[in-house]
Amino acid sequence: TIMKLEGKVAIVTGGARDLGRAISVKLAAEGAKVCLNYFDNEADAQETLALIKNVGGEAIAVQGDMTKAAAVKNLFAECNKAFGDKVDVLVNVVGGIVGRKKITEQDEDWYDFLMDVNMRSVFLCTREVVPMMPAGGSIVNFSSLAARDGGGNGASMYATAKGAVMTFTRSMAKELGPQGIRCNAICPGTIATSFHDRFNTPENRERMKASYALRREGTADEVA
């Protein structure tokens, strides 16, 4: 079989579990050398590396907080060290809703945290990758359905940050297009991941499922 991504190098932020894991494994299965970043869960990262090995892929895992410029620099340096000085694919999965708060319950730290984890991480990684991304390269950012519809109860800052990601992606598509770099955003709705196991209620998930054409939640593999 022809591997679509033979000889390509891919970085996946938040690449150790759920959506990130499915994407990391899929990229590796298609022949890319994968450098996956994880925040703090070493066990998840090791498990993902094992899954990649199972599909005959090649990967490394690098710990780091993608809201910090130094950690982002380190991620790309480690990737270069392992796989050479170019990156063909960047998938920014890092982000999350973290919790639900009404506007009067949100303090400045909450605002900063949600904007940092969802938007600053994308900004820092994109800025870092551009000088080392050849023509034909691709940047994929994870926005959210919340960016389009304002999000559910208490998700205003998450929705706002993801809206910023969507607009930033459009700006980058214009700016980087002439260099032959594609930039796209994916806006998933409810995907069955541990994210929803933690931050959603079974009743709400059932109600949302009923509103979808397929009457069910999506899966991480479908997104990948």
Give short role names for the model-derived ranges.
Residues 9, 16-17:
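Conserved glycine-rich cofactor-binding loop
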Residues 131, 174-178:
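Alpha-helical segment proximal to the catalytic Tyr-Lys
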Residues 212-223:
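A conserved structural motif in NAD(P)-dependent oxidoreductases
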